[in-house]
C-alpha cells in the first residue's frame, strides 16, 4: 500500500514522503497512530502544495533574516558599563545588554540569538555573533565604554 508519511518514521522516511509498505503495517499501525495517510491523488497534490508553501515561507524568512543581518553589520553599538580606572569592568557585558542596545536602534533581536565567544570584562572593541536564522549569522561591532564611577 502506498502511504504519505505525516511524521518522520525512522525505518521508513521523512514527513511528506510517499512510501510503499505492507497493507497490515499501514492499516494496523501507521494510519491509526496518525503517522501516515493513504496516498490518494488528492492527498499527494495537497502534500505537494503544502511543501511549496513551506519552501516559500522558509525562503521569505531567510531573505528577511539576510536583510536584517546586512543592517546589523552596517552599525556599531556602544555599551556603557561601570569600570575601574584600569579599564576592567565591574561584571561583564551580557547578551541582554546587547539586545537592549539593539532595541534602542530599532532592531528586535532576542538575547538567546546573541553569542559572545569569551566574556567581555574590559573596555574596548569587540565582535559579537548574532544567529538570525539557521544559516544566517550577523557580526555586530560592539564598543564597550566606561561610565564614570564615583568612589
Curated annotation (Swiss-Prot):
MF annotations from Gene Ontology: rRNA binding; structural constituent of ribosome
Q: Would you name any one GO CC term?
A: ribonucleoprotein complex
Keywords per UniProt: Ribonucleoprotein, Ribosomal protein, RNA-binding, rRNA-binding
Its BP terms in the Gene Ontology are: translation
Pfam families tied to this protein: Ribosomal_L9_C, Ribosomal_L9_N
The lineage's top-level taxon is Bacteria
**Which PANTHER family does the protein's record reference?**
50S RIBOSOMAL PROTEIN L9
Q: Sum up the protein's function in the record's words.
A: Binds to the 23S rRNA.
What family does the entry list? Belongs to the bacterial ribosomal protein bL9 family.
User: What is the recorded name of this protein?
Assistant: Large ribosomal subunit protein bL9
Q: Which organism is it from?
A: Chloroherpeton thalassium (strain ATCC 35110 / GB-78)
Amino acid at each position: 500500500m502506498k502511504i504519505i508519511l505525516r511524521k518522520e518514521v525512522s525505518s521508513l522516511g521523512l514527513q511528506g514522503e510517499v512510501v510503499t509498505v505492507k497493507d497490515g503495517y499501514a492499516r494496523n499501525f501507521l494510519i491509526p497512530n496518525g503517522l501516515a495517510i493513504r496516498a490518494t491523488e488528492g492527498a499527494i497534490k495537497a502534500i505537494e502544495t503544502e511543501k511549496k508553501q513551506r519552501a516559500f515561507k522558509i525562503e521569505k524568512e531567510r531573505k528577511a533574516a539576510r536583510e536584517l543581518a546586512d543592517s546589523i553589520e552596517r552599525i556599531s553599538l556602544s555599551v556603557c558599563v561601570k569600570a575601574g580606572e584600569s579599564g576592567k569592568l565591574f561584571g561583564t557585558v551580557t547578551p541582554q545588554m546587547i539586545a537592549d542596545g539593539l532595541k534602542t536602534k530599532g532592531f528586535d533581536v532576542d538575547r538567546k540569538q546573541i553569542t559572545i565567544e569569551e566574556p567581555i570584562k574590559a573596555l574596548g572593541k569587540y565582535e559579537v555573533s548574532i544567529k538570525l536564522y539557521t544559516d544566517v549569522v550577523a557580526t555586530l561591532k560592539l564598543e564597550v565604554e566606561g561610565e564614570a564611577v564615583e568612589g
